[in-house]
A protein has these predicted regions:
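N-terminal phosphate-binding or glycine-rich loops at protein starts, especially the Walker A/P-loop
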Residues: 1-42
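Short, ordered loop/turn segments at secondary-structure junctions
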Residues: 1-2, 31-36, 66-67, 103-106, ...
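Short glycine/serine/threonine-rich phosphate/pyrophosphate-binding segments
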Residues: 3-14, 38-39, 83-84, 97-111, ...
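A glycine- and small-aliphatic-rich helix-loop capping segment at beta-alpha/alpha-beta transitions
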Residues: 12-21, 44-50, 112-122, 138-142, ...
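Glycine-rich oxoanion-binding loops at beta->alpha junctions
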Residues: 38-98, 138-149
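Accessory alpha-helical/coil subdomains and C-terminal extensions
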Residues: 89, 100-102, 108-112, 119, ...
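C-terminal non-catalytic interaction/assembly regions of soluble proteins
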Residues: 246-298
Length: 298
């Protein structure tokens, strides 16, 4: 799946724990680009030195790719049965266990492979923090720090120009990242997918702030935020309404509505992939290491 902070820290912890416990009796195979590498047999024999100096590195030394779970049972353009190919390569490599790092789709595929008889240890990775079985996923806290820093920086220009600013935070279906960053950054309004918003309430809050002498407002908006009107539609119509939106994202629609209702200049900032890039923070380095050590012990 998508990259995030803490992947290399987790990989490092798995490897170093195995080397410390088993020494030369362990052989670690790196699967290139995630499930894609396991499907097409793209691997790399790893050495202890491959794991040095990567604790603080963002991204992943093994690469990654998106292999949607819903397509795992669908043969590819070359008629390759992906599940059977992964099982075949697992056995061909002589693996004792497959260690998987990923979010919802990755976890579903990991469980599918388990049901097919493979030994799998799967660790929770996502900046969305939306996986069952753990309070925190690695990558989440680092993304919170970055999104919070964006909100902090926007505050100064918002106050200087007397504008409304919308910071669009990653999160199509869940609002953990937006909620945490919004609270930490002191956002005046926070909109998340789980709670459909009422644009009239948003406008009322902004007007109330203006009447109270506040010439600016900061909104933290999840990319998956949705209005009450659209949320009330049947699923098929709801998807069509979102697809037909004339703006690049929901934040621009909200900005238009605010500007039209208040007359106050409204701007949108989209930090995008900045949120999942760069070095993991201290918390993610620790939790990634703990996850990796436990995976090796299992």
């Amino acid at each position: 799946g998508g990259d995030c902070q803490g992947l290399n820290a987790t990989i490092r912890a798995v490897a170093k724990t195995l080397y410390n416990q088993l020494g030369n009796d362990v052989e670690i195979i790196g699967i290139i680009d995630g499930y894609r590498g396991l499907i097409y047999g793209e691997t790399r024999k790893m050495k202890p030195e491959n794991f040095s100096g990567i604790l603080t590195m963002g991204g992943t030394i093994l690469g990654t790719s998106r292999q949607p779970f819903k397509l795992m049972r669908v043969v590819d353009e070359n008629s390759v049965d992906k599940v059977e190919a992964m099982k075949k390569n697992y056995k061909k490599l002589g693996l004792d266990c497959l260690v998987v790092l990923g979010g919802n789709g990755t976890q579903k595929t990991a469980n599918l492979l388990r049901e097919e008889g493979l030994n799998v240890v799967s660790l929770p990775k996502t900046i969305d923090n939306d996986l069952w079985g753990t309070d925190k996923t690695f990558g989440f806290q680092s993304a919170v720090d970055i999104a919070t820093n964006v909100i902090d920086c926007i505050h100064s220009t918002a106050t200087s120009h007397g504008r409304v600013f919308i910071i669009e935070v990653m999160g199509h279906k869940v609002g953990w990242l937006t909620l945490y960053a919004g609270i930490a950054g002191g956002a005046d309004i926070i909109l998340i997918p789980e709670i459909p918003y009422d644009i009239n309430s948003v406008v009322k809050t902004i007007k109330s702030r203006t009447a109270g002498g506040k010439n600016f407002s900061i909104l933290a908006v999840a990319e998956g935020a949705i209005s009450k009107e659209i949320a009330a539609l049947p699923k098929k119509q709801r998807k069509a309404a979102v697809a037909e939106m004339k703006y690049p994202s929901i934040s621009y629609q909200i900005a238009h509505d605010i500007e039209e209702a208040t007359g106050q200049e409204t701007r949108v900032t989209v930090p995008g992939h900045f949120q999942r890039g760069g070095s993991p923070d201290a918390y993610d380095r620790v939790i990634s290491t703990r996850f990796g050590v436990k995976a090796a012990e299992l």
